[in-house]
Amino acid sequence: MRSPERVLNSLSEHSKDVSYKFERLYRILFNEEMFYVAYQHIYAKEGNMTKGSDGQTIDNMSLKRIEKLIDTLKDETYQPQPSKRVYIPKKNGKKRPLGVPTFNDKLIQEVVRMVLEAIYEGNFEYTSHGFRPNRSCHTALTHIQKEFSGAKWFVEGDIKGFFDNISHDVLINILKERIADERFIRLVRKFLKAGYIEEWQFHNTYSGTPQGGIISPILANIYLDKLDKYIKEYIAKFDKGKKRKFSRESLDFGNARKRIVRRLKSVKDERQRVKLILELKAIEQGRAKYPNGEEMDADYRRMKYARYADDFLVGIIGSKQDAQQIKGDIKNFLADKLALELSDEKTLVTHTERPAKFLGYEITVRKSNDQRRDKRGRLRRTYGKRVCLNVSMETVRKKLFDWGVLEMTNRNGKEIWKPKCKSGLIFNDDLEILDSYNREIVGFYNYSVSYTHLRAHETPEHLV
């Protein structure tokens, strides 16, 4: 019996050949050691001690239990139990559904997840940041800071009810492009069809992946990798021009400089030369105040893209018409190829001077005074735009809502936010209460300060 490390490494190596089709994957689930590793992965994770619909938790693991589970996989009598539907409160008073699988389902899902990750992770695009090893919200925001400078328009993408609207048939067909193992495919389909439990009533799910399911994130990325690759090809066709034309100001200063340099070559009088050198320095200083490139160059276009789960952001150096065309093309691709719908109310074409919302940040592109020296040592101003990230008030409020120190009421159709007592701390002494609040505030601040500063009226302590 091969070790899990060797099994997964072998899958990763074969995945480098994009034409390779994986067979006999289902047999990996007969390897007891795979289940030991899966158990180690999920045992300590928060939420895995939550009771599933079978009323069991993940503790009290036993070898006999694993052997029995493997036997049901071998004869394909294994049937996932309906996920227990847990509702997570949202700031508007509504609740978000979360499917909590049973213990056995969690264990098998983790083994399946490891197999799928070994096959697909190496071929995912660098523009995808959600639910991936060594990637996070931070890498997505860093990507945007580095690549979106100079963008003129944003397309804020939001896929309507993504997790609940994934087409099972489309997903299975995508998996079959790389996996030629019907038993493995049948197992994935079983998980997709497992349904959920709400108020102890069984409901079938004909689309969607439970958001609390362990394999949900990897399945979501496999599904939306099609979008990532479509946009990669789109960018290759959209981009044009090697660099921007010189701006009018840059050309004028450049011509003035050439005239002075020519005069310096012929002037012998020292006082006259000093005067010309001072003029030359003034020209260099003036030139550094303006961008070197033309802001709206019809022969220069660029498109950038970043995705985290079902949210994505597109940055465009081009016209508003270009941005609207891109939005329409993405909408058509999602509908035609992935059976998904863009949310019209949340998918916006926004000028980059106005904030676009992404991962709890308000993102803008603003003028910059950054300068650099060219290969001759002369100061040049860069294009003159940089990405600015600001934590939105909505994000701060949501964080306070999650802490349980803020509540919202609706008065005549208007949201009213009120402070709320954190009743779980009432038996603590004053120092313990302060320490609890400080840890939450410092943690949130450290997360946010990597990219921007919080204005005084937006800090958690101000609202608390």
Can you say where each PLM-predicted feature lies in the sequence?
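Conserved polymerase palm-domain catalytic core
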Residues: 126-127, 132-135, 139-332, 338-341, ...
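Glycine-rich, often proline-containing surface loops adjacent to acidic residues and nearby aromatics
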Residues: 93-94, 151-153, 304-313, 418, ...
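Conserved small/polar residues in nucleotide/adenosyl-binding loops
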Residues: 452-461
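Conserved pre-catalytic core of RNA-dependent polymerases
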Residues: 2-214, 218
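Short Gly/Ser/Thr- and Asp/Glu-enriched loop/turn motifs at secondary-structure junctions
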Residues: 81-83, 307-309, 344-347
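Conserved catalytic core of two-metal-ion nucleotidyltransferases
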Residues: 338-369
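Basic, alpha-helical interaction scaffolds
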Residues: 376-449
